[in-house]
Structure formats: structure tokens, C-alpha cells
Amino acid sequence: IQTAYKVSPFTKGTCPEPEDAVKRFESRYTPIPAEYRWLLLNFGGCYLAEPWIFTLKELEKAYPIFQEAYEDYMSEYDHGPAFPIGGLGDGSIVFIDLESGRVRGCNCDYADLKEIAENFSSLLLDLVEQALELGKLCREL
């Protein structure tokens, strides 16, 4: 992960979140899923490839909006409780289904949820692999 963050131009300025800031978010809203919490505390957000993963500042803005969208749109879909973690360029919100652990995307303009990854760890590993492959291709040019 560290290597991917070093080679990616999209992670410049991304830094670990202070634990007290993470705890403030959790006391205000809800606990952050463990793997996402680890990423925030060790690296911050993730912009290696799509989907991007929110920094804490972005999460603080997105969480209330997600809660509203969850009530308005997402409650009709088949999934467990959800926690927003990022987004896609098409405006989709990316979330963790807290019951299954699956990472999914929801775009209110479409009728279905998009399956993105089996779990947060596999999503992160996929993003790291994409960034390392892109870095390798750039060096070859």
C-alpha cells in the first residue's frame, strides 16, 4: 500500500487522519467500519483509482447526505445497514453493506446496486494493484 501511495500522483497531500478526529466523527455519528478506520488512521483517503475512498473531511460532508439518500432511495434495495466510504465519477456513492461486508455502489439514476468488491480489503488490494500497474506502465513510457 505504501508503495502504491508513493507512485500515485493522486495521493499527494493525502495523509493519515488524527485518531481524535476519527473519534469525534464516531461520537457524532456512528462507528467507522474497522478496515476503513484503519485506512483513515494510516493513510487517509484513497485516490489510487476508482472508486475513490473518502478522507475524513469528505466523510464528514458525505455522511449526512448519505443518510438522507439512504432513506429516500436506498431503502428500497436489498442490502443490510450501509456505511458510505467513497464514490465514482458517475456520481455513484460507494458503501459497505455492514451485514455482508460487500462493497457496493448506488447511483440514484439507475435501478440497481452495483457490486464493486467482495469486501473492503479486496477493494483496497485491487486499487493498490491498479496503481502499481499504472506506475509500471508510466515508467515504461
Where are each of the predicted segments found?
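A surface-exposed partner-binding patch
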Residues: 1-93, 138-140
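Short acidic-glycine loop/turn motifs at beta-strand connectors
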Residues: 97-100
